[in-house]
Amino acid sequence: MAPGSVTSDISPSSTSTAGSSRSPESEKPGPSHGGVPPGGPSHSSLPVGRRHPPVLRMVLEALQAGEQRRGTSVAAIKLYILHKYPTVDVLRFKYLLKQALATGMRRGLLARPLNSKARGATGSFKLVPKHKKKIQPRKMAPATAPRRAGEAKGKGPKKPSEAKEDPPNVGKVKKAAKRPAKVQKPPPKPGAATEKARKQGGAAKDTRAQSGEARKVPPKPDKAMRAPSSAGGLSRKAKAKGSRSSQGDAEAYRKTKAESKSSKPTASKVKNGAASPTKKKVVAKAKAPKAGQGPNTKAAAPAKGSGSKVVPAHLSRKTEAPKGPRKAGLPIKASSSKVSSQRAEA
């Protein structure tokens, strides 16, 4: 009883004393540690803790949520952001919202509705469509600075290009200067002179050939003119025949007159030149009185005169023929042939 009771009596007292001693210590440090964390996070949460996205992104979300045809007002955007993100600092929110709207307009993410004259963080805003978002940034960027820079760059390279174009002109001038040198080389060549002489000779031949052709060409109109001349020639021939026939008639008439005067000359003027038998008889009779002397000679004398009376029948006919009117169109050859035939018959 003594050892166990003693121990049991001591233990509660020790425990009570320990609990009483620990309880105030544990309570003291507890509040001290518990009081530090609430004060600690309150001071450290402002600089370290950022529990909302950038203001521009919140503005875009607000416009997407309350999308309207005429756009969303700035007051509606503020209410949406404060309701969704209560941790935003209200004091700085007005300034941050104004900056976010300006950056959105500059980047082409936001746009004002038509016929809106508001400026800054007033009025209403709209989202730009996606296809316009891609086009507008390109238009805005080149429209302001890049295009001017491009123009400046374009003007810059043009000057070297012009400088490059000048050397080709110099080269052209050099080529032009070289061409006269090429022209100076041909004169010493004999082949060129011979070729020129041949060309000149060929040109002269061509001119001669052309002149020969020109000379040959005129006879063609002569051939054309020959037709009327041939017709005139026929008339001339007919006239010549007529003149010849008239001349022949005149000659025959003269011959007949000569024959009528004397028989001898008529016989000598015969064309064929053959003596007729009547002529022989007349010559024989003329010789006969010459052979005999006396009165026979006187009788022979009248025979001479009678020789003119005794004329062949064909001769008498011939003398009568030209006196009468000759028929037109009868050829002379026919009359001459008739005379020759009559002589042959005699």
From Swiss-Prot:
Keyword Nucleus among UniProt keywords: yes
Cellular compartments annotated: Cytoplasm; Nucleus; Chromosome
GO BP annotations, alphabetical order: chromosome condensation; epigenetic regulation of gene expression; meiotic cell cycle; negative regulation of DNA recombination; nucleosome assembly
Gene Ontology CC: one annotated term: cytoplasm
Extent of Basic residues compositional bias: 128-137, 172-182, 278-288
Tissues/organs with expression: Oocyte-specific.
Start and end residues of each H15 domain: 51-129
Main location: cytoplasm
PROSITE patterns reported for this sequence: H15
Compositionally biased tracts (Polar residues): 334-346
Regions of compositional bias (Low complexity) in chain numbering: 1-23, 38-48, 298-309
Family: Belongs to the histone H1/H5 family.
Biological function: May play a key role in the control of gene expression during oogenesis and early embryogenesis, presumably through the perturbation of chromatin structure. Essential for meiotic maturation of germinal vesicle-stage oocytes. The somatic type linker histone H1c is rapidly replaced by H1oo in a donor nucleus transplanted into an oocyte. The greater mobility of H1oo as compared to H1c may contribute to this rapid replacement and increased instability of the embryonic chromatin structure. The rapid replacement of H1c with H1oo may play an important role in nuclear remodeling.
Protein name as catalogued: Histone H1.8
Species the sequence originates in: Homo sapiens (Human)
Lineage: Eukaryota, Metazoa, Chordata, Craniata, Vertebrata
